[in-house]
């Protein structure tokens, strides 16, 4: 508990001079190490708790400027939240955690479809693809008709209708 109070105090001192526009949240946890399952919360520069302890099963993001990534308690979804704790979208699960940011974008999910968001928490390409790989060099391989096949402990996507899109969601030729 002393660490939690100390952490809140430090967060207050560090961010005391910030304006609302530059406001951000700092993750505080009551344990020696931050690991999945350790209760944590987010506080603002005034020391006010914005996200209470235990609201989420795990908080991946240590400082929320625009976007925080957390795991819900009730069903284990990985979601993006803003600095007001508003849910923005569900994050695509990859390698037992949230999708990696590549080329400034990461994958999100809505109603079983995949789209893309940026590091600011803005949806750049609405979820509309059945399968979608990460962006690399400005393009991503996607499909509207694909199936998932098990390959050992991993899964692979198969499709006869792959195509490429740019960061605007426009279909392009592979370069």
Where are these regions (language model features)?
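Bacterial Sec-dependent N-terminal signal peptides
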Residues: 1-22
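Residue-level detector of conserved, function-critical positions
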Residues: 18-175
């Amino acid at each position: 508990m002393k660490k939690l109070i100390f952490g809140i105090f430090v967060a207050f001192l560090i961010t005391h001079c910030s304006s609302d526009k530059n406001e951000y949240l700092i993750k505080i946890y009551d344990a020696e190490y931050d690991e999945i399952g350790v209760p944590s919360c987010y506080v603002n520069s005034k020391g006010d708790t914005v996200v209470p302890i235990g609201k989420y099963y795990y908080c991946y993001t240590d400082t929320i400027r625009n976007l925080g990534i957390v795991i819900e308690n009730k069903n284990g979804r990985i979601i993006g939240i803003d600095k007001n704790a508003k849910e923005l979208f569900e994050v695509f699960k990859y390698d037992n955690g949230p999708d990696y940011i590549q080329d400034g974008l990461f994958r999100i999910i809505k109603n079983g479809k995949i789209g893309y968001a940026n590091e600011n928490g803005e949806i750049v390409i609405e979820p509309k693809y059945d399968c979608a790989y990460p962006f690399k060099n400005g393009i991503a391989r996607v499909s509207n008709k694909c199936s998932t096949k098990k390959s050992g402990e991993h899964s692979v996507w198969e499709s006869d209708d792959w195509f490429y899109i740019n960061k605007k969601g426009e279909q392009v030729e592979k370069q």
